[in-house]
Amino acid sequence: MCGILAVLGCSDDSQAKRVRILELSRRLKHRGPDWSGLHQHGDNYLAHQRLAIVDPASGDQPLFNEDKSIIVTVNGEIYNHEELRKQLPNHKFFTQCDCDVIAHLYEEHGENFVDMLDGIFSFVLLDTRDNSFIVARDAIGVTSLYIGWGLDGSVWIASELKGLNDECEHFEVFPPGHLYSSKEREFRRWYNPPWFNEAIIPSTPYDPLVLRNAFEKAVIKRLMTDVPFGVLLSGGLDSSLVASVTARYLAGTKAAKQWGAKLPSFCVGLKGAPDLKAGKEVADFLGTVHHEFEFTIQDGIDAIEDVIYHTETYDVTTIRAATPMFLMSRKIKSSGVKWVISGEGSDEIFGGYLYFHKAPNREEFHQETCRKIKALHRYDCLRANKSTYAWGLEARVPFLDKDFIKVAMDIDPEFKMIKHDEGRIEKWILRKAFDDEENPYLPKHILYRQKEQFSDGVGYGWIDGIKDHAAKHVTDRMMFNASHIFPFNTPNTKEAYYYRMIFERFFPQNSARLTVPGGPSVACSTEKAIEWDASWSNNLDPSGRAALGVHVSAYEHQINPVTKGVEPEKIIPKIGVSPLGVAIQT
């Protein structure tokens, strides 16, 4: 994948404008260090920074149809491109690049071809015959994309905010699963799955083999590559299943013939972190070539400004988790690996976050999963995309495969609910689907390991260390006046205030701050789910430890010595235990 920048309908076609667009495109160079390109057609500019994964030799962009009347710049991976080529027998392709099909599909089907694409993508397509254009983003928003409007009437498209924020009067997140047409001058949704209507509660019975097969297909199709790759392996359920399925099926792929059947795996954490221990155990079980990266709290703190610049957010949960991922991505890229397969999306689909223990019924459980999936592009998708692309590393996420989501979201949510009296913990149906006694995918205790949020699993001292650091830079007086300084998404903790100050230095525009989600949350819940328990209403910390009793000791005993002199109640949340045994921050 890559970084894209397009300026459409610009009133200035001078050389100076071209130079400026090249300058802005270079702000995205980290996303595509292998090659860059800029195509100008009249008052339209399409720029591209390429990370070459498929057909590195001839897949440079922009891409064209036969007579070059259709021009495409795209950030994406089209997993069914070979099947689509077979449906276009009368077309000539200039490259083997998977995204080469887009221009030709448009020629055949007009604007209504986007749902034919199986993959992740953000693209701009310019039809020079009538000077019209379309822009589209993948179903869930795995790829990042923004749209802006200039005072001269131009439309700007960029993979990251930093490509357009200094030039546009207004800009916003390009909505996932949508297409923007210059002819209609509006967005329209091309992705319309049944679960988008939250009022419709699915009733399909749970079939473990159907779920297992759907996930295996999602992983296998993502092994399309002409360059070395690896897997992120924290030792949690999601990354372990991804690694297990990848290792199991890698030998029969073209990738194995090129790069060998030994799968590289990667894990990051503080010294002694839960993830390092569990990741090593899973790697030994699967026989991967495992790499561990230890970081210190100071390493993470030193990286926070870079993390905020690259992730373009001030959301607390995202920054906490993105920092170790950012550090690990640099190490991975230096090893020669160009992309990794990762486990994002499972918790949203299956209700894996620990607050789902309190879901009152199947209807509200399902509706919350719908809300969580719809918001992924602002949270985990953003983190996984931008913290890896900061170093020119691509992340692929099989749990967010369109076909797999359909299978998983069609299941009656009654089967997903946590039921202690029946021995069902969070994500029980996913665990059960891969519980194979004869040919085990994972060790039993790993398969049934309880949920750890990434920012917790890398080491409980990490979050406490950030809070300590923020407390030294944000005073009580600053917090007292926070609502006047930041009236939108007012930070309610010193950590949040610290992140916000950094974000505003990089992205001071009002449009920029509006791209970041806000509102109260407990252990990553949506605001609506807080209604499930009255004691959650005063929650200030989105960490998973705010909803899990076994983590109380981490809050009590892992405080960094630098907090000396800071009142503990300002740093450490108070924990109460609910009747379900779930610790809730109060």
From Swiss-Prot:
Gene Ontology MF annotations: asparagine synthase (glutamine-hydrolyzing) activity; ATP binding
GO cellular component, one term: cytosol
Binding residue positions for ATP: 232, 268, 342-343
Organism per entry: Pisum sativum (Garden pea)
Ranges annotated as spanning the membrane: none
Enzyme Commission number, as recorded: 6.3.5.4
GO biological process: L-asparagine biosynthetic process
Annotated catalytic residues: 2
Keyword Transport: no
Pathways involved: Amino-acid biosynthesis; L-asparagine biosynthesis; L-asparagine from L-aspartate (L-Gln route): step 1/1
Reactions performed catalytically: L-aspartate + L-glutamine + ATP + H2O = L-asparagine + L-glutamate + AMP + diphosphate + H(+)
Site (Important for beta-aspartyl-AMP intermediate formation): 344
Tissue expression remark: Root nodules.
Entry keywords, A to Z: Amino-acid biosynthesis, Asparagine biosynthesis, ATP-binding, Glutamine amidotransferase, Ligase, Nucleotide-binding
UniProt cross-references to Pfam families, sorted A to Z: Asn_synthase, GATase_7
SUPFAM superfamilies: Adenine nucleotide alpha hydrolases-like, N-terminal nucleophile aminohydrolases (Ntn hydrolases)
This protein's encoding gene: AS1
Domain Asparagine synthetase: 193-517
Top enzyme category: ligase
Name of this protein: Asparagine synthetase, nodule [glutamine-hydrolyzing]
The organism's place on the tree of life at top rank: Eukaryota
